């Protein structure tokens, strides 16, 4: 059953974290934040909603990098019950979709809880002060849409505005996805 994200809590301060990346290194938020803003997105490998946007996420991330915005992906699912989301499969998923951003493993699920993440994908767009300005979706595309010219680039446009003004758009469309798979 699909889950929607909650509305943006403008000004909420990003929580620090220290997580292992698929490159086997440990990173903190301070290591990875962007000069003009940061996107943190909770994703996984098995969810059809994530699979549908993975290539668009890779593209938008490359475009955001050009304007000083970094992207950080975090996988917080229970890998014991969802082995497709394992650390090794995270590496494979990243390669398959040509991710050029850090893909971090939240093994203890503390970061997902700290951020009140509810689904995959769940996007958090922060300004350069690491204050939340966007909690929306990647774009207006439907799950199987591949016609780029018909899609409104909501994440990109919001982060572009944030990079220029430190403020996110008032109107935001919630992301939809699979629920985070919590450990029991």
Give short role names for the model-derived ranges.
Residues 182-184:
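Core SAM-dependent methyltransferase catalytic element
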Residues 1-163, 168-172, 179:
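Chalcogenol-based redox active-site neighborhoods
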